[in-house]
Amino acid sequence: MSIIYDDAPLEDRIHRALSDTFKHRAIETAQDVITGKRDALVAEVDNWEDFRTHAASIRDHVLENLDYYVRQFATNAQKNGAQVHFAPTDNDALDCILDIFEAEGAKSCVKSKSMMTEEIGLNTFLESHGIKPVETDCAEHIIQTAGNAPSHIVVPALHFDRTSIRNLYHEQKGYEGTNDPEEITRFLRKTLRPEFMNAPIGVTGCNFGVAETGSCTLVSNEGNARMASSIPETQIVVMGTERIVPDLRSLDVMMKLLVRSAVGAKISGSFSINTGCRREGEADGPKNVHIVIVNNGRTDILAHEFRPIDRKS
């Protein structure tokens, strides 16, 4: 299933984007901040390029042995109580996820930021079946409210500034506050908290799946991913086939690179390693975990010159 945000011809969209000076300024400012922070942190690491080379070798090793590691990950995830589903295509993934919603009788869910769900067009698909997905990442909530597509893989609302966000929430959500980011965040927290508490299903992505433990990891700066994966009774993890690392030691290497490279920080605000369903005596966590592993052309790429895409994704 493809996802369409704008029916206008490509040429019209290009001219519209090139003439939008507001978005140009917003994107340039945000990119300058992120790039500056990243460069400063990278300069503190003497062996940064060695780290990158080591991480690339880990990713290459996994891709060369992908069948083995996917099987190991799935086996260990099942031992932890999770149900693992394999989806060859985006439509297979959507049908699988819909089956889970229907089995649970669920008509809504909370979501954490996930480019995998963006790739398969999950929100549009769920809405077409009468299911309400609620984005809980601040930036994702902004673009969902605006009906926009993400403008950046890490910072999806890069094309908004604080004033446009304030005006958007005033028009769409009745927000009466200022354009102060902290005040807007407090409004979002108050708005989203009931959604977390009442949602029957939480949908998340997966930064890395750990083969030796069957764990799914989540990185966020707002804590929303942890809430989406711990409060609802059912969690659906949607991940690409290539998102596997062999073990926790390899995960450590990838994490040291990920946050520095993505947002110019030493560590994220929240990092979770989720291993299966809630166990007896535990106060939170989902009773049911479904892991949907999506191929959608990823293994086809391994045989071609574009193979490095799988390593870097």
Predicted regions, residues:
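The feature marks the mature, well-folded catalytic cores of soluble enzymes
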Residues: M1-P308
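Conserved small/polar residues in nucleotide/adenosyl-binding loops
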Residues: S313
